[in-house]
Each structure stands twice: as C-alpha cells, then as structure tokens.
UniProtKB/Swiss-Prot annotation:
Modified residues (N-acetylserine): 2
Described function: Binds fatty acids in a 1:1 molar ratio.
Protein known as: Fatty acid-binding protein 2
Tissue: Midgut.
Organism of derivation: Manduca sexta (Tobacco hawkmoth)
Length: 132
C-alpha cells in the first residue's frame, strides 16, 4: 500500500459534470466543482483508515474501517450511508442516499490515482485523474 500518506492532486477529469447533473446539482455548483482542483490523502492506523480531502468546501477527514457501513454527511449536508472497502491498491466507496447509490472506485498505481464514478440513476461513467 505504497499510496498511503501520499497527497494526490486532481490533474484532469472526464464526464464529471454529467455525474453532478445526475445528482441534481445546480449549474453554478457544478461549475464550481468542475473548476476545483481537490487533493486527497489516505492513511492507515491499525485496522482503521482515514481519507483527508481538500477542495472547494475546505478540508474534510473521514475515518472508517474497511467493509463497515457508517452514517456520513456529504456535500450540502445530505445524510447518507457510506462504506469503504480496501482491497490492495483498490478502494471502493459506496454512498447510499435519497438520490440513489453512487460508487467511487479509487485505483492507485504508484503516483497515479484514477477514480471511476458510477451511479444507480445515471447511465454514464465519470473519471477523475490524480497525481502524487
């Protein structure tokens, strides 16, 4: 898990605006999120993990255990159920909320991170590419 402790910064994205539209966000919010250049870092502490992300909303740290669902709050304060599963260099985050189920599959490969985003209420696929 050589990716632990590295800070990954967004370098490009594909179809992220389509995913945001499917989630019902306003055009202004979509533009702000698409223009943002977030970072993220994952760390381990025993059998727990934390992901710290920085971006348009400031800094946010989420702590979790692999495979354990928990109550979470995202975006504009929406309460959801989240579950992260860590499997080697792949971290899958499933979010269940009123707007459906979204899956964020994070694949780490050295200094590269590709996040593939799908949703139960959208036929598209979005990708966000990060570099450490």
């Amino acid at each position: 898990m050589s990716y632990l402790g590295k800070v990954y910064s967004l370098v490009k994205q594909e179809n992220f605006d389509g995913f945001l539209k499917s989630a019902g966000l306003s055009d202004d919010k979509i533009q702000a999120l698409v223009s943002d250049k977030p970072t993220q870092k994952m760390e381990a502490n025993g059998d727990s993990y934390s992901i710290t992300s920085t971006g348009i909303g400031g800094e946010r740290t989420v702590s979790f255990k692999s495979g354990v669902e928990f109550d979470d709050v995202i975006g504009a304060g929406e309460s959801v159920k989240s579950m992260y599963t860590v499997d080697g260099n792949v971290v899958t985050h499933v979010v269940k909320g009123d707007a459906g189920v979204a899956t964020f599959k994070k694949e780490y490969n050295g200094d590269d991170l590709v996040v593939t985003i799908t949703s139960s209420n959208w036929d598209g696929v979005a990708r966000r590419y990060y570099k450490a």
